[in-house]
């Protein structure tokens, strides 16, 4: 079994604790968070794990270190783990400072330890199936992608404990959600370049973005359009459409997968009873492969860096035209 340490025990860390305990290949041996209540909450899912006295002790206990802390300390913990010979599985983003993240990626590569980033759709059925359909020609010529994300409030209710998500310094929907769909788009269409972007912020300048719009393109000129907004009475909407000349594919809410040949989108399967469990198990299955040196589908740290560069460009309103 893979002895695993979890650092950062908010909602994402707690979910990972729950699902790693369920998985036969992992043993959660140590937990750490600066908030004692978060440690207690995670320990309810992994009662056999030790709540470490500090991050250093937690890192020393495991062979794999999972990091779900806010972005700012992520580099420090990742390098401490990797230089100690531990495999590292990170939540995204790698950070918020691009040069610091470039340095992190270079130094992680130099250690030679297994590393991956938890873009949650990487090992999922939708990305796997759409990739196969595109390669088989079932979609015709790929024609780009549309990303639409809207929320009545940000952060979402289930993220209330992660207060940093509401601030521009580390949070916001672009880093937290749109990044997943940019990763997905690059996996299918190839590397993207930011053409133009606009991000709007509330009058209280330390809060995160409320609206974003952007256009990105592949080297061949295929467009990826992004629209995100917060506000108004509406349900959450998280949607990626990969467009083809014969058929298009749409992924909604991270797990609903549908196909259109020009008519209404038709679901490929009923909604699963527990989509999060299916997604996390797929990620963990591939993490086992990666640690064993086998081929895997998880996001690499290089892919995560590319996404971070795009995200920070969108948030800054950068692009070819600026």
Language-model-detected regions and their locations in the chain:
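N-terminal Rossmann-like dinucleotide-binding module
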Residues: 1-45
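Beta-loop-alpha module in the N-terminal Rossmann-like domain of NAD(P)-dependent dehydrogenases
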Residues: 16, 46-105
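Active-site loop of classical SDR/Rossmann-like NAD(P)-dependent oxidoreductases
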Residues: 34, 271-285, 299
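C-terminal helix-rich "cap/oligomerization" subdomain common to oxidoreductases
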Residues: 57, 64-66, 219, 286-322
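Hydrophobic residues in well-ordered beta-strands that form the structural core
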Residues: 67, 90, 115-117, 226, ...
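Rossmann-fold dehydrogenase core element
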Residues: 103-121, 141-145
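Predominantly a Rossmann-like dinucleotide-binding segment in NAD(P)-dependent oxidoreductases
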Residues: 121-198, 202-204
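Contiguous beta-strand/loop segments that form the cofactor/metal-binding neighborhood of enzyme cores
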Residues: 182-256, 284-293
């Amino acid at each position: 079994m893979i002895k695993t340490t979890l650092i950062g025990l908010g909602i994402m860390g707690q979910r990972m604790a729950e699902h790693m305990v369920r998985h036969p290949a992992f043993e959660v041996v140590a937990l750490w968070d600066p908030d004692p209540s978060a440690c207690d909450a995670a320990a309810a899912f992994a009662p056999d794990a030790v709540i470490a006295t500090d991050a250093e002790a937690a890192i020393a206990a495991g062979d794999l270190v999972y990091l779900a802390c806010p972005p700012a300390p992520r580099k420090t913990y990742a390098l401490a783990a990797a230089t100690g010979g531990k495999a590292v599985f990170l939540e995204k983003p790698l950070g918020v400072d691009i040069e610091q993240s470039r340095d992190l990626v270079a130094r992680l590569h130099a250690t030679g330890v297994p590393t991956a980033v938890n873009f949650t759709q990487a090992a999922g059925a939708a990305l796997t199936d759409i990739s196969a359909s595109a390669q088989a020609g079932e979609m015709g010529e790929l024609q780009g992608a549309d990303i639409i994300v809207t929320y009545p409030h940000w952060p979402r209710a289930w993220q209330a404990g992660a207060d940093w998500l509401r601030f521009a310094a580390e949070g916001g929907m672009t880093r937290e959600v749109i990044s997943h769909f940019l990763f997905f788009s690059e996996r299918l269409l190839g590397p993207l370049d930011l053409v133009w972007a606009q991000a709007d912020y509330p009058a209280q300048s330390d809060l995160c973005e409320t609206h974003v719009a952007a256009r990105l393109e592949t080297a061949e000129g295929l467009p990826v359009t992004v629209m995100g907004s917060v506000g108004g009475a509406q349900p959450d909407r998280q949607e990626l459409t990969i467009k083809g000349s014969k058929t298009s594919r749409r992924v909604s809410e991270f797990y609903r997968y549908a196909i259109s040949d020009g008519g209404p989108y038709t679901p490929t399967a009923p909604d699963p009873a527990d989509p999060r469990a299916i997604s996390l198990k797929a990620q963990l299955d591939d993490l086992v492969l990666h640690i064993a040196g086998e081929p895997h589908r998880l996001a690499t740290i290089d892919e995560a860096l590319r996404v971070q560069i795009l995200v920070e460009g969108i948030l800054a309103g950068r692009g070819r035209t600026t």
